[in-house]
Amino acid sequence: ADAAKACVGYLSEQPPLYPEMTVQEYLDFVAELKGVKHAQRKQQVLAAARRTGLEEVLPRVIRSLSKGYRQRVGIAQALLGSPQLIILDEPTVGLDPAQVIEIRSLIRELGKAHTVILSSHILSEVKAVCDKALILSQGHLAAVVDLAAEERDLEELFLELTAPEETSDKKED
């Protein structure tokens, strides 16, 4: 279980941030929780801050940050420990349009070095940052879609695949 945890970075829809901590303190704390050795901790925190555009706000208290910067802090903590897989749950929810563009760009950049799984109900978000989409319906995999090759509109495809099946009683009406 510990080996699996070390390979995965996770950002929940509502990142569990400690508003009274500075960004630096929080990232150091998470790195320690993830078992990053003390000698590597400072380097990993700075690398995660650099990749997420947080270098300038490391000394700031988290409660003073905008929602977009808080999301960046959440993504930075997911990068600590150098995971191969990063899971992002609704990473742009509640962000303004400029922040959405910044986070999308960051996710695409992360995809160059990591496997990124994006969980989202916002299909335009999926189209903007993903190569493939896995569509789930009632807890089951309904389709794997290569977004570059798919000619149909993703929203239409989603509705087609997830529409409730008509029962024989309804067909008679």
Question: How would you label these PLM feature ranges?
Answer:
Residues 61-68:
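Conserved ABC ATPase signature
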Residues 28, 32, 39-57:
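Conserved ABC ATPase "signature" region
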Residues 75:
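Hydrophobic anchor residue at the start of the ABC signature
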Residues 80-84:
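A short, proline-enriched helix->beta-strand linker immediately N-terminal to the Walker B motif
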